[in-house]
């Protein structure tokens, strides 16, 4: 079915920053996608094009990316008459129009918007849900479909919050639930208990939420944060059913080959900065003491030695985000160096759907897990909810059970679970190997 029109406009993300929305029109209707953006972005990511004109949107405008869709991609796309059901052909066309390794000519935000909108249009042309079309594209098994464990970011530190806490995300994972719906109820109850405990211990303003919906109290150490979460799990009556995941985002506090856990203090004491092995010892002690099942970005994005050293003895899922940035070359290196055993999949890091699917397939082939992820600057777009089901990864992180741009994805997963009924299973404790269920 022919695409009659491709059109982009600038809209706003959850931080109030401009982002790209793309509409693709076929006989079946108008199909829309909005591109997210990150705060802690890896240096090896595809280029998100921003205008840089400080007099408008403080330099964060996306008028050039929008113009690239409307003036370069749209005419070429309509003229090429590409079969939108063939995602590889769609993305190959987009990549050939750009011609750079990191999508810096047109912008990954321009390319991805079109790539996702095309997948939505193709699903409609086939008269199937988006998750089914994505399963077809990735040759995923669909009996049963797998609903993911939601890793809910309930407490924020690092670059996402004030306070001295260095680690960026503390997530709860309701692995003991029997269904996604029950996982959400458990997550919601723990979240509300955490909020009231936080206000009690740190004052009412501590209940205010960060970019991803988690509380951001003035906490100094990881232990203090974890004690608070464990207490909230107990108070909610869900002990044993809820595990914990960390996203350390440690590239953010890596300085001169060391890790500065007091990085938000401009006068931090350099004699207290930690070496890779010292930081690994800290993680080991946390894993011993708390029900942690997953640690993301424990070390900086090019500190390969620290990653490989820690992975040997970690005993929990080690997730690569800044290390791999959903980039097939970086993923291959991480697999070869035995640096991690799970990929954080962010579609806008690589900038097209086909490349995202390939990244997941490469990871599965190496026996890795895959956690599909939102970005901190999100929108009401729910694409990744269908993606996590289509790829059967068994795990997703898309913020707290609060703020509509986070809940949009979680609510879409509730709908998908309901629609699939007994054709789907909840990953639960098998989140790391969801694709094998």
From Swiss-Prot:
Q: Name one Pfam family in it.
A: Enolase_N
Assigned EC number? 4.2.1.11
Residues that coordinate or bind Mg(2+): 247, 296, 321
The cross-references to InterPro entries, in alphabetical order and at most eight, read: Enolase, Enolase-like_C_sf, Enolase-like_N, Enolase_C, Enolase_CS, Enolase_N
Which locations, inside or outside the cell, does it occupy?
A: Cytoplasm
This entry's comment on the bound cofactor is:
Mg(2+) is required for catalysis and for stabilizing the dimer.
Q: In which pathway does it act?
A: Carbohydrate degradation; glycolysis; pyruvate from D-glyceraldehyde 3-phosphate: step 4/5
Gene Ontology cellular component annotations, sorted alphabetically:
cell surface; cytosol; extracellular region; fungal-type vacuole; mitochondrion; phosphopyruvate hydratase complex
Biological process GO annotation list? glycolytic process; regulation of vacuole fusion, non-autophagic
Per the Swiss-Prot or TrEMBL record, the active site comprises 212, 346
Cite the GO molecular-function annotations of the record: magnesium ion binding; melatonin binding; phosphopyruvate hydratase activity
Reaction catalysis annotation? (2R)-2-phosphoglycerate = phosphoenolpyruvate + H2O
SUPFAM superfamilies assigned to the protein according to its UniProt record, in alphabetical order:
Enolase C-terminal domain-like, Enolase N-terminal domain-like
Annotated keywords = Cytoplasm, Glycolysis, Lyase, Magnesium, Metal-binding
- Claim: Zinc is one of the keywords in the record: no
Query: How is the quaternary structure described?
Result: Homodimer.
Q: Protein name, please?
A: Enolase 2
Q: Which organism is it from?
A: Candida glabrata (strain ATCC 2001 / BCRC 20586 / JCM 3761 / NBRC 0622 / NRRL Y-65 / CBS 138)
């Amino acid at each position: 079915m022919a695409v009659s029109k491709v059109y982009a406009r600038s809209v706003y993300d959850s931080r109030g920053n401009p982002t790209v929305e793309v509409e693709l029109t076929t006989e079946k209707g108008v199909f829309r996608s909005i591109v997210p953006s990150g705060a802690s972005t890896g240096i090896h990511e595809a280029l998100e094009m921003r205008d840089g004109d400080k007099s408008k949107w403080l330099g964060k405008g996306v008028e050039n990316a929008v113009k690239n869709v409307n003036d370069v991609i749209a005419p070429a796309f309509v003229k090429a008459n590409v079969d939108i059901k063939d995602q590889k052909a769609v993305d190959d066309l987009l990549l050939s129009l750009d011609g750079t390794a990191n999508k810096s000519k047109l912008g990954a935000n321009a390319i991805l918007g079109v790539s996702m909108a095309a997948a939505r249009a193709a699903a409609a042309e086939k008269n199937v849900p988006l998750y089914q079309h994505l399963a077809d594209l990735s040759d995923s098994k669909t009996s049963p479909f797998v609903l993911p464990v939601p890793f809910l970011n309930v407490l924020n530190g690092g670059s996402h919050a004030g306070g001295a806490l260095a680690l960026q995300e503390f997530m709860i994972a309701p692995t003991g639930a029997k269904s996604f719906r029950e996982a959400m109820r458990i997550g919601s109850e723990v979240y509300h208990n955490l909020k009231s405990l936080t206000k009690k211990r740190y004052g009412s303003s501590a209940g205010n939420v960060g970019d991803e919906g988690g509380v951001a109290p003035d906490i100094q150490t990881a232990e203090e944060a974890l004690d608070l979460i464990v207490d909230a799990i107990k108070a909610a009556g869900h002990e044993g059913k809820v595990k914990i995941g960390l996203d350390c985002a440690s590239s953010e506090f890596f300085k001169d080959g060391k890790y500065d856990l007091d990085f938000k203090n401009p006068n931090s004491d350099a004699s207290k900065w930690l070496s890779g092995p010292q930081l690994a010892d800290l993680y080991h002690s946390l894993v011993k003491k708390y029900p942690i099942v997953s640690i993301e970005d424990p070390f900086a994005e090019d500190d390969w030695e620290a990653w490989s050293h820690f992975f040997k003895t970690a005993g929990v899922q080690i997730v690569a985000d800044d290390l791999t940035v959903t980039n097939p070359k970086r993923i291959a290196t991480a697999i070869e160096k035995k640096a991690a055993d799970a990929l954080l999949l962010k579609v806008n890091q690589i900038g097209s759907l086909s490349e995202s699917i390939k990244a997941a397939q490469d990871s599965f082939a190496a026996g890795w897990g895959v956690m599909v992820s939102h970005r901190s600057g999100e929108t009401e777009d729910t694409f990744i909810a269908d993606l996590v089901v289509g790829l059967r990864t068994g795990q997703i992180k898309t913020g707290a059970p609060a703020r509509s741009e986070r809940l949009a994805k979680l609510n879409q997963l509730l709908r998908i679970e309901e629609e699939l009924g007994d054709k789907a299973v909840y990953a639960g404790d098998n989140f790391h190997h969801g694709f094998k269920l």
